């Protein structure tokens, strides 16, 4: 064995040890930093003020649903456009939190079980709840302030079809108080705004996780991202078909939900088309503080393949007695 081959072997052994140490540090971080057991409480405690604000938003949302809306003047001439049938909801109100909140959380948990990143799980749930609750508060605040009558207001006001008006030509309703109250909450659509808030957040989350915009031309990924948005659109259409909302109500609700969801998502995650769009900001910050380079799973596989290839080349050079050291 030549002196050059000896030093090449020594250098290769040293590099191998450094690589093993680096892998060990990365594995240690993956196992100890990103789990609920080790850092779940710490992450939640760091965002305790956010959770307090969420509780306040819930209280505001409950209060907005208890107070009476503005009883806008409704005259006899206006009743022609408000005489649509009083139908049941195609999408029941109880189902909205199920598909707009519970379903996305189930998806978040599935990704957590695969990657065990507590930052991702915590921030996705927190961002989703902020999206739907802020949307709900905005929607119901506008509902209460505007008091726009629903398309089926006539049958809420006059369930027996017997019309009654005051001296100014305004309606004097004799229907159930709760139905008349609900009849003044047309603008904007709550079903639609909640649907777009929760499902737009889910769509953005999925697009980042599956790298839907990585310029590789996988249309199947795009279909998966579009599906939640399509579901939200169908909910909005059902509100018009059921004569519970005017089309303007649905459009406004969709706009509110989409914008709020996008803003809330970007508070915790990079753009889905970004190289680091697959993870939350906090994940990369934690890794950076520990001096560990973080890549996506795909990039990690590529780096490992390159490392194995370099190791294989070095071994071949050693066996052939060829030095790789600079001459």
UniProtKB/Swiss-Prot annotation:
<feature type="transmembrane region" description="Helical">
    <location>
        <begin position="93"/>
        <end position="113"/>
    </location>
</feature>
<keyword id="KW-0812">Transmembrane</keyword>
<dbReference type="InterPro" id="IPR000326">
    <property type="entry name" value="P_Acid_Pase_2/haloperoxidase"/>
</dbReference>
<keyword id="KW-0381">Hypersensitive response</keyword>
<comment type="similarity">
    <text>Belongs to the PA-phosphatase related phosphoesterase family.</text>
</comment>
<dbReference type="InterPro" id="IPR043216">
    <property type="entry name" value="PA_PP_rel"/>
</dbReference>
<feature type="transmembrane region" description="Helical">
    <location>
        <begin position="244"/>
        <end position="264"/>
    </location>
</feature>
<dbReference type="GO" id="GO:0071456">
    <property type="term" value="P:cellular response to hypoxia"/>
</dbReference>
<feature type="transmembrane region" description="Helical">
    <location>
        <begin position="118"/>
        <end position="138"/>
    </location>
</feature>
<dbReference type="GO" id="GO:0008195">
    <property type="term" value="F:phosphatidate phosphatase activity"/>
</dbReference>
<dbReference type="GO" id="GO:0016020">
    <property type="term" value="C:membrane"/>
</dbReference>
<protein>
    <recommendedName>
        <fullName>Lipid phosphate phosphatase 1</fullName>
        <ecNumber>3.1.3.-</ecNumber>
    </recommendedName>
</protein>
<dbReference type="InterPro" id="IPR036938">
    <property type="entry name" value="P_Acid_Pase_2/haloperoxi_sf"/>
</dbReference>
<keyword id="KW-0472">Membrane</keyword>
<dbReference type="GO" id="GO:0010224">
    <property type="term" value="P:response to UV-B"/>
</dbReference>
<keyword id="KW-1133">Transmembrane helix</keyword>
<feature type="transmembrane region" description="Helical">
    <location>
        <begin position="51"/>
        <end position="71"/>
    </location>
</feature>
<feature type="transmembrane region" description="Helical">
    <location>
        <begin position="217"/>
        <end position="237"/>
    </location>
</feature>
<dbReference type="GO" id="GO:0006644">
    <property type="term" value="P:phospholipid metabolic process"/>
</dbReference>
<dbReference type="GO" id="GO:0009626">
    <property type="term" value="P:plant-type hypersensitive response"/>
</dbReference>
<comment type="function">
    <text>Plays a general role in cellular responses to stress, may be by attenuating the signal produced by phospholipases. Exhibits both diacylglycerol pyrophosphate (DGPP) phosphatase and phosphatidate (PA) phosphatase activities. Substrate preference is diacylglycerol pyrophosphate &gt; phosphatidate.</text>
</comment>
<keyword id="KW-0611">Plant defense</keyword>
<feature type="transmembrane region" description="Helical">
    <location>
        <begin position="187"/>
        <end position="207"/>
    </location>
</feature>
<keyword id="KW-0378">Hydrolase</keyword>
<dbReference type="Pfam" id="PF01569">
    <property type="entry name" value="PAP2"/>
</dbReference>
């Amino acid at each position: 064995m030549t002196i050059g081959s000896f030093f090449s072997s020594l250098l290769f052994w040293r590099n191998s040890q450094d690589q093993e140490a680096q892998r060990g540090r990365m594995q240690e971080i993956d196992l100890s930093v990103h789990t609920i057991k080790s850092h779940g409480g710490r992450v939640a405690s760091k965002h305790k003020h956010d959770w307090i604000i969420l509780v306040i938003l819930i209280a505001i949302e409950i209060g907005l649903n208890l107070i009476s809306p503005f009883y806008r003047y409704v005259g006899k001439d206006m009743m022609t456009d408000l005489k649509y049938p009083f139908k049941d909801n195609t999408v029941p109100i109880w189902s909205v939190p199920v598909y707009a909140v519970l379903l996305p959380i189930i998806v978040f948990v599935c990704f957590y079980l695969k990657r065990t990143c507590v930052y991702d799980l915590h921030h996705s749930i927190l961002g989703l709840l902020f999206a739907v609750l802020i949307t709900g508060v905005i929607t119901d605040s506008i509902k209460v302030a505007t008091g726009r009558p629903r398309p089926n207001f006539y049958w809420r006001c006059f369930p027996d079809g017997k019309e009654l008006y005051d001296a100014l030509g305004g309606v004097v309703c004799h229907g159930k108080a709760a139905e008349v109250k609900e009849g003044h909450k047309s603008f904007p659509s709550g079903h639609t705004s909640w649907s777009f808030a929760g499902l737009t957040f889910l769509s953005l989350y999925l697009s980042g996780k599956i790298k839907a915009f990585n310029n590789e031309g996988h249309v199947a990924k795009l279909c998966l991202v579009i599906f939640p948005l399509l579901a939200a659109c169908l909910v909005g259409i059902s509100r018009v078909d059921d004569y519970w909302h005017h089309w303007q109500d649905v459009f406004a609700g969709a706009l509110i939900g989409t914008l709020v969801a996008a803003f809330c998502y970007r508070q915790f995650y990079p753009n889905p088309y970004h190289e680091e769009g697959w993870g939350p900001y906090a994940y990369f910050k934690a890794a950076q503080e520990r001096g560990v380079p973080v890549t996506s799973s795909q990039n990690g596989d590529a780096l490992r393949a390159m490392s194995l290839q370099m190791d294989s080349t070095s071994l071949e050079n050693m066996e052939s007695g060829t030095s790789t050291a600079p001459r």
